[in-house]
């Protein structure tokens, strides 16, 4: 099964992230959200908090498709 990392940086556009994640998951692609910050909690452009699966630092050595 394919696997993809979706990177979430502070100020990300939530609709772009959520729609992308939704489409990939509907296609049976494993998706892991990664925060490009010290914490898994990331705040979007519209101040909506989202908690990523992991941080980029925690998964830096993992390979994705």
Q: What does each model-found stretch correspond to?
A:
Residues 1-65:
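Extended, subdomain-level signal for the structured scaffold at the beginning of enzyme domains
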């Amino acid at each position: 099964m394919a696997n993809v990392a979706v990177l979430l940086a502070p100020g990300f556009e939530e609709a772009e992230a959520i729609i992308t994640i939704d489409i990939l998951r509907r296609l049976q692609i494993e998706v892991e959200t990664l925060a490009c910050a010290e914490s898994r909690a990331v705040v979007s452009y519209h101040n909506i908090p989202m908690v990523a699966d992991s941080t980029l630092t925690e998964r830096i050595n993992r390979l994705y498709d």
